[in-house]
Amino acid sequence: MALGKNKRISKGGKRGKRGKAQETMARKEWYDVVAPSNFEKRQFSKTICNKTQGTRIAADVLRGRVFEANLADLNQSAGEEEAYRKVRFTVQEVQGRNLLTQFHSMEMTTDKMASLLRKWCTTMETTVEVRTADGYTMRLFVVAFTKPQANQQSRNCYAKQRLVKWLRMRVTKMIKRRLSKVQIKEAVSLLTRNVLSDALVRRCNPIVPLREMRIRKVRVVRTPKFDAQALLNAHGTIPTSVEADPREVEEAVEAAPAAAKAAE
């Protein structure tokens, strides 16, 4: 019979004693995510991160995180009409408990894009890549839909190919002319407040009647070398971190004994 080690009767010593279990949330810290100053609501989100321990620095972990917010929540004066657009920000710098972000991308929701599609019309799409004055390269995706002309008898409203090419050329020229002269902060304001899209509609309607013309997606594909002073200028006055109000706990009132109730 071969002799083997019986795990049930062997008494091996422990290699090391386990330390006292520490609560998970005790090792973490909360940070406020701050949007640039061209948005009305600056602190739009909170995030959590492990505290700095040894060579693992919390600021290095937080840089590069991307956060998404609804445009109607960021610009509350615009109302619910802007709720179909999602804006993303990327963290570039950590200042105390505030995360200073910069514009990352913007796009329409899927249900809004699906509601614009119709039959018997031409869908025109174009992509424009433009470089801002401070070195950011943005890629814009524009979509447009035709509509019937006045007193038209035909059911469809298809556009001729030469008009589609003409419209794409005008959209490309206008976007490059408007955005190449401004910095990223002004470019985002032109996009989020519909200044650029309204100008495109006014200039392109004489070419072909348009039912809708939207900038459905914007992406920052290339960024310049990080400049801390430029980021601080984009944020302006940074709001202080607002902590949650402490919860008030009412004192419990002891119930009277049963004997005392009976005596009463």
Swiss-Prot record:
Region (Disordered): 1-24
SMART domains: Ribosomal_S3Ae (SM01397)
Annotated compartments: Cytoplasm
Any GO BP: translation
A cellular component term, taken from the record's GO annotations: cytosolic small ribosomal subunit
Sequence ranges of Basic residues compositional bias: 1-19
Any one GO molecular-function label of the UniProt entry: structural constituent of ribosome
InterPro entries documented for this protein: Ribosomal_eS1, Ribosomal_eS1_euk
Domain of life of the organism encoding this protein: Eukaryota
Keywords noted in UniProt: Cytoplasm, Ribonucleoprotein, Ribosomal protein
Subunit structure: Component of the small ribosomal subunit. Mature ribosomes consist of a small (40S) and a large (60S) subunit. The 40S subunit contains about 33 different proteins and 1 molecule of RNA (18S). The 60S subunit contains about 49 different proteins and 3 molecules of RNA (25S, 5.8S and 5S).
Family, similarity comment: Belongs to the eukaryotic ribosomal protein eS1 family.
Protein name as it appears in the record: Small ribosomal subunit protein eS1
Organism: Leishmania braziliensis
